[in-house]
Regions:
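Active-site groove signature of glycoside hydrolases
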Residues: 15-42, 126, 130
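Active-site clefts of carbohydrate-active enzymes
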Residues: 118-141
């Protein structure tokens, strides 16, 4: 683990930097995930960032962070991005408690347009599970919420990350140990959740607004959330219904018609919009 090394020692730093150069030269890697980045010396991070910027223009440093002000580890002299554990908790908790106000508050606090918002314009690594936490299919009390929670993951600001196996609903409880979360997989088990996530990824990749757009809450209810993403003249409304019943949403869409990014169908906002049950 890098944090256990003497990062003030020039010989240690040069060795680590030579390793990075070698990986780029031999394997053409595109970036590094830095374990426990919140424990690393900030001076070392600054030097590593300088190396990254010099050896490959789009080389990305992604740091593991848990709490605190992520700007400490995510800036022009440190990581390009960090793990968004604040919204990770808000994602599953909002669905389990039927309280979309929790995640909408976190998203606006992080990415909104007000001057006090923390990470507007930055791109944190978003996730609903990973190798260190209980799988989302296990932690959700209502498995029907798997589809809408991934819809929210790909609709919110950030870089969406899908943990292997979770794209088909693999379960695993952290309380049973790390091997439960990191099993060997012989072959994919594709299903409707896999297809749904693939469709979300396709829509996200093709949308400037979803990739780097602003964030604005439009409608927040206990089990429903609608927000706007905007970039370069493109507006996307992300609508989440975490209920087994349809919901008639009445709000100012700012237009009369739109195109569904998932289905390609036209959508008429006249008379309100019905959000289908999950």
């Amino acid at each position: 683990c890098i944090r256990d090394r003497n990062l003030q020692n020039p010989a240690v730093k040069n060795y680590l930097f030579d390793v990075v150069r070698g990986w780029v030269r031999d394997y053409d890697i595109d970036g590094l995930r830095l374990d426990v980045a919140y424990c690393l010396d900030l001076g070392f991070l600054a030097e590593l960032r300088g190396l990254a910027d010099s050896i490959k223009p789009e080389f990305a440093l992604v740091g593991e962070t848990l709490h605190g002000d992520y700007n400490r580890w995510m800036n022009d002299h440190a990581c390009h991005s960090v793990t968004n554990y604040e919204c990770y908790k808000g994602l599953y908790s909002s669905f389990n408690t039927g309280n979309m106000h929790e995640i909408s508050y976190s998203l606006n606090r992080q990415f909104g347009s007000e001057q006090w918002c923390l990470y507007t314009g930055k791109h944190l690594l978003s996730f609903v599970d990973n190798h260190d936490v209980t799988r989302i299919a296990t932690i959700l009390t209502d498995k029907g919420c798997l589809h809408p929670i991934y819809g929210l993951l790909f609709g919110m600001p950030g870089v969406p990350s899908v943990y292997y196996g979770s794209e088909w609903g693999m379960e695993g409880d952290k309380r049973n140990g790390d091997p439960t979360l990191r099993p060997a997989v012989e072959k994919p088990e594709e299903n409707d959740l896999t297809a749904w996530i693939a469709a979300l990824a396709h829509a996200h990749t093709g949308s400037k607004a979803l990739c780097r757009g602003s964030y604005r809450n439009v409608l927040v209810q206990p089990k429903q959330l609608i927000f706007e993403r905007y970039a370069d003249g493109e507006r996307v409304l992300v609508a989440i219904n975490a209920d087994a019943n349809p919901f008639d949403a009445h709000f100012d869409a700012g237009c009369g018609r739109a195109v569904d990014l998932i289905t390609g169908d036209d959508h008429d906002f006249g008379g309100g919009s019905t959000l289908e049950p999950y």
